[in-house]
């Protein structure tokens, strides 16, 4: 069976000093088809990053399972590339060598890994900076290096953990467009987490809303805006359209309602 499948996932952490365990995720079921761009939206503490870490294989669930193409995810693997909010680049390596680092660990010959790394840099528009030092790049450019590095191993799934959270507003918007452009050309399966309603609406082909206490998937919506941008290449027109604004207000109201329900309960 192809695709990513999450079944009855629960993650609980031991309580401090004998306290009851903290349940971060409970009863999470999610299926992601190949080529989908799925965005998980929710406030801090709703378990978004915990869910991504389970998919990445960084942590094992207390109950339930994650399967990729029918096989259980038991640890990290080259079939899943991760882009972090903090760029996690190696400052002693130049841009090209940072992108090629995972391939080096896989013992890919130097000429081949540099060819692949340069190809990925072209994909994100940084081929002219291949031999630049990463600390000399802007935040947005460093995040592009992170995306290129995650793609270099040709993963089936790209996992993006609030990768634009540390960027200024203008850079964030240009990065959103870049991410959609890369997705449109590669059609990788993407799981992206954010707490920004507008970002979620713009990027997602399918949006899942998560709520805390413990983290669960409350709602799921199919959305047209990512495909609309790829057709028109006009992000401002997409984000200022009547249906985008209507969706944004609907989601903000829904999130407030969910948060109020959690406070009352």
Swiss-Prot record:
UniProt keyword Disulfide bond present: no
Mode of membrane association: Peripheral membrane protein
Binding residues for ATP: 42-49
InterPro entries to which the protein is assigned, alphabetical: AAA+_ATPase (IPR003593), ABC_transporter-like_ATP-bd (IPR003439), ABC_transporter-like_CS (IPR017871), ABC_transporter_ATP-bind (IPR050166), P-loop_NTPase (IPR027417)
Database matches in PROSITE patterns: ABC_TRANSPORTER_1 (PS00211), ABC_TRANSPORTER_2 (PS50893), TAUB (PS51250)
Stretches that traverse the bilayer: none
Function as written in the Swiss-Prot or TrEMBL entry: Part of the ABC transporter complex TauABC involved in taurine import. Responsible for energy coupling to the transport system.
Quaternary structure annotation from Swiss-Prot or TrEMBL: The complex is composed of two ATP-binding proteins (TauB), two transmembrane proteins (TauC) and a solute-binding protein (TauA).
Protein name: Taurine import ATP-binding protein TauB 1
């Amino acid at each position: 069976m192809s695709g990513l499948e999450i079944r009855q996932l629960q993650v609980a952490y031991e309580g401090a000093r004998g306290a009851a365990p903290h349940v971060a995720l409970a009863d999470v079921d999610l299926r992601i088809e190949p080529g989908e761009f799925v965005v998980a939206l929710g406030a801090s503490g709703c378990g978004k990053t915990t869910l991504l870490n389970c998919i990445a294989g960084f942590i094992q669930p207390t109950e339930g399972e994650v399967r990729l193409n029918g096989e259980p995810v038991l640890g990290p693997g080259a079939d899943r590339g991760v882009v972090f909010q903090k760029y996690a680049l190696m400052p002693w390596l130049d841009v090209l060598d940072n992108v090629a680092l995972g391939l080096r660990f896989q013992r890919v010959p130097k000429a081949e890994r540099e060819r692949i790394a340069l190809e990925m840099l072209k994909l994100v528009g940084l081929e002219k900076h291949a031999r630049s030092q990463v600390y000399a790049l802007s935040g947005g450019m460093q995040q592009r290096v992170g995306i290129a590095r995650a793609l270099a191993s040709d993963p089936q799934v790209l996992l993006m953990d609030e990768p634009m959270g540390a960027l200024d507003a203008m850079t964030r918007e240009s990065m959103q467009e870049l991410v959609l452009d890369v997705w449109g050309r590669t059609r990788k399966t993407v799981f992206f987490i954010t707490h920004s309603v507008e970002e979620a609406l713009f990027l997602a082909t399918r949006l899942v809303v998560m709520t805390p206490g413990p983290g669960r998937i409350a709602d799921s919506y199919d959305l047209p805006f990512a495909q609309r941008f790829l057709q028109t290449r006009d992000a401002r027109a997409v984000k200022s359209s009547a249906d985008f604004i209507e969706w944004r207000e609907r989601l903000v109201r829904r999130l407030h309602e969910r948060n109020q329900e959690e406070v009352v309960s």
